Amino acid sequence: MIAENIFKKLYLTPAQKKLIVNAPREYLDFLGDLHYDTAVDGKTEGFYDFVQIFATTQAELEHLVKKYGKAGKYDCLFWGCYPKGGGKIKSDIKRDTVWTAFQLVEMHAVTQVSIDDTWSALRARPLDTYKK
């Protein structure tokens, strides 16, 4: 992983208030000195500019989306990360099922990126930002 490339794909900057939940150790090591929270710790809804959750099962993804779906500011960068199909990590998550999880908190998927050989990320935005 080349940090600069991943940060650019995710629109991740040092100045943002970041929440990164359930990330694998390799990803956290990759972030280096970048400051981020791994739990909400009493912060109010709408605190974060960047929210990134990692899940390996659909049930876990839905739980994390419900738990952290409102942690970000309105229209924050909200990323749901899941293992790529056919990769090292076995998972029941597919791109379409991530969409379903986002709908639980009235968001829709807008962008997909590859983080590395193992993880994909799907960005969500509030439903009312969807242009018909």
Outline where the language-model segments fall.
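Conserved Class I S-adenosyl-L-methionine
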Residues: 92-112
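Class I S-adenosyl-L-methionine
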Residues: 106-132
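Acidic/glycine-enriched edge-of-secondary-structure segments
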Residues: 21-31, 46-62
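Beta-hairpin (beta-strand-turn-beta-strand) motif
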Residues: 56, 82-85, 115, 127
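N-terminal, charge-rich interaction modules
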Residues: 1-32
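Short acidic low-complexity segments
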Residues: 37-48
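Mid-chain, well-packed structural core segment of small domains
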Residues: 61-93
